[in-house]
């Protein structure tokens, strides 16, 4: 029989007692009173904070948005299946966040940052970024001075966008709003290829899954997914996911911005976000205001769009930025930027409705797309009279600024005279000249789908148009002339185009452009 050694047994017991950990932890738990339509009312979470995440017994999370006397209103970040009256919900003592990293580029993710493109989990170093975050304070910003080239002639010439600007794209449905923004993303390939990428985030809110899949496929084919992230909250997703999708996109953009790099974010579109927010607010029984939107819908958009800015170039100041997530503190650099292109859909061109006026007043200008222009074949259908860029002019390259200086005025004058000319046929030579030049400029500013232009090509053709060098070219042949003109300059005078790209515009350059235009327009005589 084996001998029992008391000393050995007591040593083992001592060791086990030392390693014993109490499994009991203090958790604040509440119970679900009511659930439905993506909203749960919970009793018992008396110390919960506004905006805090709560976790249900099936693992689903929700955000606390209403704090009432005897219960809290929680919006669910997912389907409510599995949650019923009496289910438990516990505090997590953290706010909604997502994990962002370099390997998120090229992926399609949902509002919570989880991939939905079937390409497996996102690897590499990931940094936790809060969905909601205070915008950088005044001392952490600097004025917009660098251009963000959209590749769209009408925009880069007349409504220029700078890095760190918020430029609204507004218009009726089917007027090419998304196309303007997607072309801008495609145009950043030039900078990616040159090793100076502008990281792009496309946020699709309340769109059909097939539409988002089509956009992802097109960006992939054009090589643009190499620097783009798509955040998708589809039409079938719960309203809270659609409300928070733009915040998720902004958090991804802030990761690039705060690490000293330029980023561009497209919100497509904020009208659908406002509708989803209205739905959530009404279900939470908040009092409705104008058009049944809640009173804080302005604040919803302003706090989102203020997160886009140009960060001060001084690293030491940038490191002290307000509300900086702890995870980012080791990689913060100054000089980054986040440019926002929010999209708003109008009803029958009414820009004086509630949401359009709100967003117009928040942003630094707007690109207004006109249904009538679109239907008459002017694409992109930009209404130059109503469109404006409040800060982008400082960011234009010098050559473009010189060339496009009078273009906006010329086109506004042309539209006025064109309307006047419909009433009478007897026009003097000066008026006829303005109308003929205007018609050719309209043709020059037309552009095909997904075909952005480099800035030097834009400057060259706009110079030719503004100096009336195309007067001998029939209006219906202007697009053909433009193609030949740009091809000729690229083949024979690449040095001239490089000088234009660098911002130069002297007599030597203008002589080359004028001689080329004269030579090529001769065949139309």
UniProtKB/Swiss-Prot annotation:
Gene Ontology terms, cellular component aspect? plasma membrane; proton-transporting ATP synthase complex
Key words, A-Z: ATP synthesis, ATP-binding, Cell inner membrane, Cell membrane, CF(1), Hydrogen ion transport, Ion transport, Membrane, Nucleotide-binding, Translocase, Transport
**Binding sites annotated in the UniProt record for ATP:** 171-178
* Known EC number: 7.1.2.2
Task: Give any GO molecular function from the UniProt entry.
Answer: proton-transporting ATP synthase activity, rotational mechanism
Q: How does it sit in the membrane?
A: Peripheral membrane protein
Catalyses which reaction? ATP + H2O + 4 H(+)(in) = ADP + phosphate + 5 H(+)(out)
Do the record's keywords include Zinc? no
Site (Required for activity) found at 387
Cysteines joined through disulfide linkages? none
Subcellular location per UniProt equals: Cell inner membrane
Please give the PROSITE patterns that the UniProt record associates with this protein. Answer: ATPASE_ALPHA_BETA
User: Which enzyme class, named as a word?
Assistant: translocase
Q: What is the first-listed, main subcellular location in coarse terms?
A: membrane
**Repressor keyword on record:** no
The entry sums up its family as follows: Belongs to the ATPase alpha/beta chains family.
User: What is said about its interaction partners and assembly?
Assistant: F-type ATPases have 2 components, CF(1) - the catalytic core - and CF(0) - the membrane proton channel. CF(1) has five subunits: alpha(3), beta(3), gamma(1), delta(1), epsilon(1). CF(0) has three main subunits: a(1), b(2) and c(9-12). The alpha and beta chains form an alternating ring which encloses part of the gamma chain. CF(1) is attached to CF(0) by a central stalk formed by the gamma and epsilon chains, while a peripheral stalk is formed by the delta and b chains.
Q: What does this chain do?
A: Produces ATP from ADP in the presence of a proton gradient across the membrane. The alpha chain is a regulatory subunit.
State the PANTHER family in the record: ATP SYNTHASE SUBUNIT ALPHA, MITOCHONDRIAL
Output this protein's name: ATP synthase subunit alpha
Annotated source species: Flavobacterium psychrophilum (strain ATCC 49511 / DSM 21280 / CIP 103535 / JIP02/86)
Q: Which gene does this sequence derive from?
A: atpA
